[in-house]
């Protein structure tokens, strides 16, 4: 997908294996509850802008996870098919998260290749 840096499935596998990626599932809570990539934090795309602008303590309280830092290198956003992941990546980059990337293959590819 054009418009934002992407990560491929082999690259994502490598980042996850090394523990260097922060993974964000931007699908709805219902979609994520039905299955997601292990280790992903679910923040629906509709909440993402406010989430990324929260104080770290508020983010921690709401999502039970550390808020990403602007300088974090490997912030990977994904959805079901790629569109919301792209939207989320563009949003994060516009807020100064320069390491934000879209897993363009999305959960659909993960499910096909990893299940």
Swiss-Prot record:
EC number: 2.8.1.3
GO cellular component, one term: cytoplasmic ribonucleoprotein granule
InterPro entries, alphabetized: Rhodanese-like_dom, Rhodanese-like_dom_sf, TSTD1_mml
Subcellular location field: Cytoplasm, Perinuclear region
One GO molecular-function entry: thiosulfate-thiol sulfurtransferase activity
Regulation: GSS(-) is a potent inhibitor of TSTD1, since the presence of the sulfur dioxygenase (SDO) strongly increases the TSTD1 catalytic activity.
SUPFAM superfamilies xrefs: Rhodanese/Cell cycle control phosphatase
PROSITE patterns to which the protein is assigned, alphabetical: RHODANESE_3
Any single GO BP term: sulfide oxidation, using sulfide:quinone oxidoreductase
Known tissue expression: Highly expressed in kidney, liver and skeletal muscle. Lower levels of expression in heart, colon, thymus, spleen, placenta and lung. Weakly expressed in brain, small intestine and peripheral blood leukocytes. No expression in the cell lines EFO-27 and HeLa, or the normal breast tissue cell lines MCF-10A and H184A1.
Keywords in alphabetical order: Cytoplasm, Transferase
Catalytic site positions: 79 (cysteine persulfide intermediate)
Catalytic activity: thiosulfate + glutathione = S-sulfanylglutathione + sulfite + H(+); thiosulfate + 2 glutathione = glutathione disulfide + hydrogen sulfide + sulfite + 2 H(+)
Major localisation: cytoplasm
Rhodanese domain span: 17-115
Keyword Manganese among UniProt keywords: no
Pfam families assigned to the protein according to its UniProt record, in alphabetical order: Rhodanese
UniProt feature coiled coil, ranges: none
Task of the protein: Thiosulfate:glutathione sulfurtransferase (TST) required to produce S-sulfanylglutathione (GSS(-)), a central intermediate in hydrogen sulfide metabolism. Provides the link between the first step in mammalian H(2)S metabolism performed by the sulfide:quinone oxidoreductase (SQOR) which catalyzes the conversion of H(2)S to thiosulfate, and the sulfur dioxygenase (SDO) which uses GSS(-) as substrate. The thermodynamic coupling of the irreversible SDO and reversible TST reactions provides a model for the physiologically relevant reaction with thiosulfate as the sulfane donor.
Name of the featured protein: Thiosulfate:glutathione sulfurtransferase
Source organism (scientific name): Homo sapiens
Lineage, opening ranks: Eukaryota, Metazoa, Chordata, Craniata, Vertebrata
């Amino acid at each position: 997908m054009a418009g934002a840096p992407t990560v491929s499935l082999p690259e994502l596998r490598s980042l996850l294996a090394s523990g260097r990626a922060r993974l964000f599932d931007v699908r709805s809570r219902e979609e994520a509850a039905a299955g997601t990539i292990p280790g992903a934090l679910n923040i629906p795309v509709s909440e993402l802008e406010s989430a990324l602008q929260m104080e770290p303590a508020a983010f921690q309280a709401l999502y039970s996870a550390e808020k990403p830092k602007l300088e974090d290198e490997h912030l990977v956003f994904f959805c079901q098919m790629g569109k919301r992941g792209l939207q989320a990546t563009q949003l994060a980059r516009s807020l100064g998260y320069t390491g934000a990337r879209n897993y363009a293959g999305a959960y659909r590819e993960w499910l096909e290749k990893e299940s």
